Amino acid sequence: MKKIFIVGSINMDLVIDSPYMPENGETITGSNFMENPGGKGANQAVAVSKLGGASYMVGKVGKAFGRELKETLSSYGVNIDYVKEEENISSGIAVIVVVDHDNRIILDKGSNALVDKKLIDNALKDANEGDYVVCQLEIPQESVKYAFEVAKSKGLTTILNPAPAAKLIDGILENTDYFIPNQTETELYIGILPDTIDKAKEACIKLTEAGVKNTVITLGTKGSIAYSNSKFVFANAYKVEAIDTTAAGDTYIGALTAKLSEGSSLEDAMDYASKASSITVTRRGAQKSIPYKNEIK
């Protein structure tokens, strides 16, 4: 089985439902407060593990919530040999306000800002040709760049979820095999909001012209579109009653990667990822909302 190294963020999500987004200076009453282990990196690592892949988390936690975050990852079958604890800083924190089944997120990177070359070297020394490295942008971009440089030197496949969207430093895109943004991120990167199929195709072409090898854009309720080897690939969304979209994108990334690592086609992997994320949004929470492989029909 191919190893999948997720080099990324590990957060504690502090979640509260709100009837609406408060105005400046306004205090309102929320409900259903929860503490949920999260972070895009950790969520994707859990998704990989729950959906059939060999998941290895590479990241850092701090004093606050650190032990709990590691124990939670391990409980889902994620290898935590490359998760380091830092004593003098908090773990990453995400404050998530849920309004009408959608969410707004504020991050404090905390220990995620300390993911460095030493940690990456320690993890990827154990990687073999054909393994996978997955990154997001909740850790320093220099660390993403380095992880991908090491990955390509060892013959690994690299996957970038460019979230939160930010201008990419030189050296990342050219070492990215799969670039997987959502609609909002796509618009921020290339100025095209892919809210129709024609615009999604246009966005894929423009990303290819910018140097992306394989593009997969998630389109929410419209499914997802990919452009690979000069061909478009589509996957439909599955209609469900969404309750919480917090981990939908992370589920998609993890499911897609797990399936690709098994040798599946991109089309099959995208359909599998759509099925998995459609289940996630019907449940509250982040990692606990991600389905297991045996739940995907």
Locate the predicted segments by residue:
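Glycine-rich phosphate/adenosyl-contacting loop at the front of the ribokinase-like
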Residues: 1-58, 66-71, 242-243
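Hydrophobic anchor at the start of a short beta-strand
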Residues: 4, 54-55, 80-81, 158, ...
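Conserved phosphate-binding/catalytic region of the ribokinase-like
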Residues: 4, 167, 197-297
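Conserved N-terminal subdomain of the carbohydrate kinase-like
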Residues: 24-27, 35, 50-131, 297
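Alpha-helix C-terminal capping segments
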Residues: 45-54, 98, 258-263
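Conserved beta-alpha-beta core of the PfkB/ribokinase-like small-molecule kinase fold
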Residues: 132-202, 222-224
